A protein has these predicted regions:
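Residues lining hydrophobic/aromatic ligand-binding pockets adjacent to catalytic sites
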Residues: 1-127
Length: 128
């Protein structure tokens, strides 16, 4: 019998999310459901010397209450430079930063071309 996991997409998936995927035979990305504001779909936290900081992908939500995750458009492509700068500033002295930076930076570069939140989340999930 196959083990299956079904989950909504998250921006920069956390270790538990990756562990869940590794523990099943089939993983289904469930993004054909309603987008929810102030959730992990378009944001995540990083550690900074001042405490945690939210990294949020700006998305179009005004007047789109019933939009699905896979229909949610990114409203400002400048989020990429801001997020990458925050990651660099706060993790450049971390162990293994140089190793991780070499494969993480190209993901942010690829994300520039993606107009939908779901596509960005899928990109990070597939590569991480």
């Amino acid at each position: 019998m196959s083990k299956v996991a079904i989950s909504q997409s998250n921006y920069i998936p956390w270790k538990g999310y990756i562990d869940m995927i590794a523990s099943v035979d089939v993983f289904v990305l469930y993004d054909d459901m309603q987008y929810t504001k102030r959730d992990w779909r378009n944001r995540n936290k990083i550690k900074t010397p001042q405490g945690t900081k939210w990294l949020s992908i700006p998305v179009e939500v005004k007047g789109k209450y019933f939009q699905k995750i896979n229909e949610t458009k990114i409203s400002d492509p400048n989020w990429i430079a801001s997020h990458w700068s925050s990651i660099q500033q706060n993790y450049k002295k971390a162990p293994y930063y140089a190793d991780v930076c070499h494969w993480l930076k190209p993901l942010f570069d690829q994300a520039k071309e993606l107009p939908l939140l779901s596509n960005v989340n899928r990109l990070f999930l597939q590569e991480i």
